[in-house]
Amino acid sequence: MVVKVGIAKLGNIASGVMAELLLDERADREDMQTFMATSGTKLQPEDIDRVVSTMKAWEPDFCIVVSPNGVLPGPVGARDELLKAGIPCVVITDDITTKKEGWEALKASSFGYIIMKADAMIGARREFLDPVEMADFNGNLVKVLALTGAFRKLQTELDKVIDQVKEGKKGADLVLPKVVMTSDKAVDGEFSNPYALAKARAAYEIAQAVAGVNVKGCFMTKEWEKYIPIVASAHEMMRQAAALGDEAREIEKAGNGIIRKPHKKDGTIVSKITLISKPE
């Protein structure tokens, strides 16, 4: 059986850059296929409608709906429409746990969710953010999510859903993830050296704090002379978070202790630790 996994990418967060790649890192899995439909950079109704229509036509076994601020009308409407079409959905979004009404509604719904608390908002001020700065910020953020363990936890949760489909479950019978990706959850089981774990945890906490700084710079400060250094400082925080993630990984390398968990062609996850060894 080949499981069809849809990815509806609405706008952009760093988790969306890697969503389907984490499930098939060498593009050689034979048990599943992915298809992504994207609204591009915006969340306009017509763009979201195009994504939903395309995804319905492909008829995936389940759909991952990735977006910033997953309680906005656009992402909410998209997953509601997909659910009406009989397509189970897993929501991947940034930290919406402070948005009480929308967050409570998501928790009470039948949707799965993975809340990536460190997938922070960018410093989107024209005086500061150009294409190079945007790419640099997202590159640092992807590194933080990868090297702290957050991406592995996300991938593992999605693989659990794929495995259920392979077992014959479908629709409402699927048990979907309900995960808030905290720093403790991200680093759990990822490191043998406690200093590496501490650095990775610090990286995640710093990245998580970036969102609040960028909210201040983008929405709460009106004078350009003041908001430019605020958003610039947030991007410097993300750069340091990425550096801490690198340091954590280098410590694990020095002890020959990097955990690797590749997929086999049939989707089975195997693992190894020492570099010169075969995954089992």
From Swiss-Prot:
Q: Name one GO molecular function term.
A: ferredoxin hydrogenase activity
Q: In which pathway does it act?
A: One-carbon metabolism; methanogenesis from CO(2); 5,10-methylene-5,6,7,8-tetrahydromethanopterin from 5,10-methenyl-5,6,7,8-tetrahydromethanopterin (coenzyme F420 route): step 1/1
InterPro entries, per database record: MTD (IPR002844), MTD_sf (IPR036080)
- Keyword Cytoplasm attributed: no
Alphabetically sorted, this entry's keywords are:
Methanogenesis, One-carbon metabolism, Oxidoreductase
Its domain of life reads Archaea
Classification via Pfam families: MTD
Known EC number:
1.5.98.1
An example GO BP is: one-carbon metabolic process
Q: Which reaction does it catalyse?
A: 5,10-methylenetetrahydromethanopterin + oxidized coenzyme F420-(gamma-L-Glu)(n) + 2 H(+) = 5,10-methenyl-5,6,7,8-tetrahydromethanopterin + reduced coenzyme F420-(gamma-L-Glu)(n)
What the record says about family reads: Belongs to the MTD family.
Q: What is the recorded function of this protein according to its Swiss-Prot or TrEMBL entry?
A: Catalyzes the reversible reduction of methenyl-H(4)MPT(+) to methylene-H(4)MPT.
Q: Which NCBIfam families match?
A: PRK00994.1
Q: What is this protein called?
A: F420-dependent methylenetetrahydromethanopterin dehydrogenase
